[in-house]
Amino acid sequence: MAGMRRLELAEALHLGPGWRHACHAMLYAPDPGLLFGRIPLRYAVLMQMRFDGRLGFPGGFVDLRDGSLEDGLNRELGEELGEAAAAFRVERADYRSSHAGSRPRVVAHFYTKLLTLEQLTAVEMGAPRARDHGLEVLGLVRVPLYTLRDRVGGLPAFLENTFIGNAREQLLEAVQNLGLLEPGSFAHLKISTPP
C-alpha cells in the first residue's frame, strides 16, 4: 500500500513508544436486496465521511496502555457509531492487516467484522445520535459493490472519491479476499487491484 509497509501484528506491537496505533474496522453484512429489482447488492459494507471530507472506516487512535488494540477500537466504534455498536465486539479474530508509515510514525491496523443485516442497519440508524456525529464523522455510506452497465457507475465511480490513508486499498483487498464481489468483478474494474 503506497507509502506504507505491511508488517505482522507482533512486529507492529513491538515498534516502541515513538509509534502511534490507529485501528479501523470494515463492518459488512450479507444483503439479499436488489437495486432497481435486478442488480444484486450481495453485501452491505459501511464506510464513513470524515471531518476532513475523505472517506474512511470507523475507528481511530488507540492507546495500548488502556488494554488491547481491540479494546481501543471498540471504544472508538462506540463513540463514532453510537449505542448499536454495543451489540457486537470486534475481536482479534477479525484482524486483517497492519501497515506502518514513517511520517508520521503511525501503524494502521485493519479489521473486518461480519454482522447481520439487522445489526448493520441498526448501526446506520443510530449513528446520527453518536457522540462524534457531526464532528469527527459526517455520516455513514454504503459502498456500492456492483458495476452498472456503463462500467462507470457503482463501485468504479465510488473509488474515484478521496480516501484517507490506505482506506481505499484496505477496502479493495478486503472485498476481494472475503469474496464480497461477483466472481470476475475485479477484471472489469479499471483500477489497480491489491496485491
Swiss-Prot record:
| Predominant localisation class | nucleus
Single GO molecular-function term? metalloexopeptidase activity
User: What does the Swiss-Prot or TrEMBL cofactor note state?
Assistant: Binds 3 or 4 divalent metal cations. Acts specifically on U8 snoRNA with magnesium as cofactor. Has broad substrate specificity with bound manganese or cobalt (in vitro).
Give me the Gene Ontology terms describing cellular component.
Answer: cytoplasm; nucleolus; nucleoplasm; nucleus
Sites where the protein binds Mn(2+) 3: E76, E80
Sequence positions that bind substrate = H24, R50, F57, N166, Q170
Subcellular location per the Swiss-Prot or TrEMBL entry: Nucleus; Nucleus, Nucleolus; Nucleus, Nucleoplasm; Cytoplasm
Which SUPFAM superfamilies does the UniProt record give?
Nudix (SSF55811)
Name the residues that bind Mn(2+) 4. Answer: H99, E173
Q: Which cofactors does it use?
A: Mg(2+); Mn(2+); Co(2+)
Family indicated by similarity: Belongs to the Nudix hydrolase family. NUDT16 subfamily.
Query: Subunit notes for this chain?
Result: Homodimer.
Q: What is this protein called?
A: U8 snoRNA-decapping enzyme
Question: What is the originating organism of this protein?
Answer: Ovis aries
According to the entry, what is the taxonomic lineage of the organism? Eukaryota, Metazoa, Chordata, Craniata, Vertebrata
